[in-house]
Amino acid sequence: TVAGPPIGGAKSGINFDPADPRKEGVLKRWYAAVAPMLRNYYGTGGDLNVDEIHEVIPMTAELGVLHPQEGVVNGYYKNYSKVEKLRAITRLQSGVLLPIVDERFTPDVSKKYTIADMITGWGVSEGVRHYYELWGGTMNHKTAIIQGWGNVSAAAAFYLAKHGVKIVGIIDRDG
């Protein structure tokens, strides 16, 4: 693993129309199939057209998965006691739902964006910032085009702009 926990890496997806009324059933069957991995060494979350708070967390909880990242905790922190692992998972359970109250980290405090809404976009921005920190240069006065306008891309654009990046365009699946 280049930058993350030494537990391997994978990406999974479902090729399915998110507007199809059978979406909930498809997701529930998929989570049931991967639940053993979600408990031991794999993590999942919200992504394209799948909401972490309203779909992923409740659907995986119905299967006895404590948190969609439970497997990452169990896989990465092998030396943790059961109590320490449970404490880490409990922090995930409460942490992702917390509203961001510091105006430096949210476009609008009154909209009550949560950690789950903003964290991946923040990570994208931090990755870009870290690149310039390692290789020289600055983000200030750079230009960027953002692909999509979901949680990740919108939050990434917000944090990139905070670092002085000028967002000059947004592209979505329709162009």
Residues covered by each model-derived region:
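Glycine/serine-rich phosphate-binding loop and adjoining beta1-alpha1 elements at the start
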Residues: T1-M139
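NAD(P)-binding Rossmann-fold cofactor-contacting core
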Residues: H163-G175
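Glycine-rich Rossmann-fold phosphate-binding loop(s) that bind the pyrophosphate
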Residues: G148-G150
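Aromatic pocket-lining residues of Rossmann-like dinucleotide-binding sites
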Residues: L160
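N-terminal Rossmann-fold NAD(P) dinucleotide-binding loop
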Residues: S153-A154
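Hydrophobic Val/Ile/Leu positions in short beta-strands of Rossmann-like dinucleotide-binding domains
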Residues: A144-I146
